[in-house]
Amino acid sequence: MTNLRKTHPLMKIINDAFIDLPAPSNISAWWNFGSLLGICLIIQILTGLFLAMHYTSDTLTAFSSVAHICRDVNYGWLIRNLHANGASMFFMCLFLHVGRGIYYGSYLFKETWNIGVILLLTVMATAFVGYVLPWGQMSFWGATVITNLLSAIPYIGTTLVEWIWGGFSVDKATLTRFFAFHFILPFIVTAMVIVHLLFLHETGSNNPSGLNPDSDKIPFHPYYTIKDALGLLLMVLLLLLLAMFSPDMLGDPDNFSPANPLNTPPHIKPEWYFLFAYAILRSIPNKLGGVLALLMSILVLLIIPLLHTSKQRSLMFRPISQILFWLLAADLFTLTWIGGQPVEQPFIIIGQVASILYFLLIIALMPLAGLLENYMLKPKW
């Protein structure tokens, strides 16, 4: 009798995706982040489900319902801290996953890459609407400022903003619909993750060398299941350390005050994982221009496959492009820092230079470096 996992219609799918999947023998720890993101998504859905059992999406009771979860619900404080810091872990893994894709040329799997970028946008939307739910000061003003950006769209902008708000300001209707969106979006994300994996398994994984790995494949289980388990252990350790010992380290102190439409916080800023995009938005002194730059900061990822000029796939053997890649990483750190600073000199000019450099590196400098490296590969005799 053949093994059930190879014959049963459902088990066969799981087997082909996680057990007998042929994987390159040389993929490094940078390939762990896909599985870590899957775990993050499961953690977020489970903790979110338990929070939703006790949360009320009403402007009068939302803030106190979150306080009630932390004070009166069994392990409510832990569930809430895991959910809030789980989002930070999610984005940490996301950024590293995307960075890996850029470094090793994984973006040349165009379908997998494109759905990945759409996934990134969807997760960002989910995190944004989720941040509004506790109805603290920064929740309220963050929602007001970010939704207001849509009013920059010519002709339909103002109508669109009021339609999203469900009134003339961020109020009860806004909170209720944001809760509905925050509940449904993770399931849409899960469906998209399955499609992401489907496209990936059409081609098989890339590897650090960027060469065709077909000549040397090993089964996913036990080799990469155990390797992923180690990554999972380290991530859960970091998450638990964060949630248990300093749960509010990455949050904003303003969110301990209930939302007050009559009192604007001195510095309105989003969570750390949006600061780089927020810095790009603020670096352009025009509203519509800023909104377009904000959108482009993520959508530029979609054109990276079209800008690949090198004869080699990976950056492993391309020292000039490596320098530019790490310059891009440093630039993103700079933008993240600037996004959290007040709008005054010298932060304004640093943000503007960093924003220009961000787009310049991706659109011009890295493709040019690829061409230069191609030229340097040619024998000169």
From Swiss-Prot:
GO terms for MF: metal ion binding; ubiquinol-cytochrome-c reductase activity
Transmembrane segments: 33-53, 77-98, 113-133, 178-198, 226-246, 288-308, 320-340, 347-367
Domain of life: Eukaryota
The keyword Heme is annotated on this UniProt entry: yes
The keyword Iron is assigned to this record: yes
Chief location bin: mitochondrion
GO annotation (BP), single: mitochondrial electron transport, ubiquinol to cytochrome c
Subcellular location: Mitochondrion inner membrane
Pfam families on file: Cytochrom_B_C (PF00032), Cytochrome_B (PF00033)
Topological category with respect to the lipid bilayer: Multi-pass membrane protein
Keywords: Electron transport, Heme, Iron, Membrane, Metal-binding, Mitochondrion, Mitochondrion inner membrane, Respiratory chain, Transmembrane, Transmembrane helix, Transport, Ubiquinone
Residues forming coiled coils: none
Residues spanning the signal sequence: none
A single cellular component GO annotation: respiratory chain complex III
Residues binding heme b b562, per UniProt: 83, 182
Cofactor(s) required, per the database record: heme b
Family of this protein: Belongs to the cytochrome b family.
Quaternary state and interactors: The cytochrome bc1 complex contains 11 subunits: 3 respiratory subunits (MT-CYB, CYC1 and UQCRFS1), 2 core proteins (UQCRC1 and UQCRC2) and 6 low-molecular weight proteins (UQCRH/QCR6, UQCRB/QCR7, UQCRQ/QCR8, UQCR10/QCR9, UQCR11/QCR10 and a cleavage product of UQCRFS1). This cytochrome bc1 complex then forms a dimer.
Additional observations: Heme 1 (or BL or b562) is low-potential and absorbs at about 562 nm, and heme 2 (or BH or b566) is high-potential and absorbs at about 566 nm.
Role noted for this protein: Component of the ubiquinol-cytochrome c reductase complex (complex III or cytochrome b-c1 complex) that is part of the mitochondrial respiratory chain. The b-c1 complex mediates electron transfer from ubiquinol to cytochrome c. Contributes to the generation of a proton gradient across the mitochondrial membrane that is then used for ATP synthesis.
Protein name listed in UniProt: Cytochrome b
Species of origin: Isoodon macrourus (Short-nosed bandicoot)
Lineage of origin: Eukaryota, Metazoa, Chordata, Craniata, Vertebrata
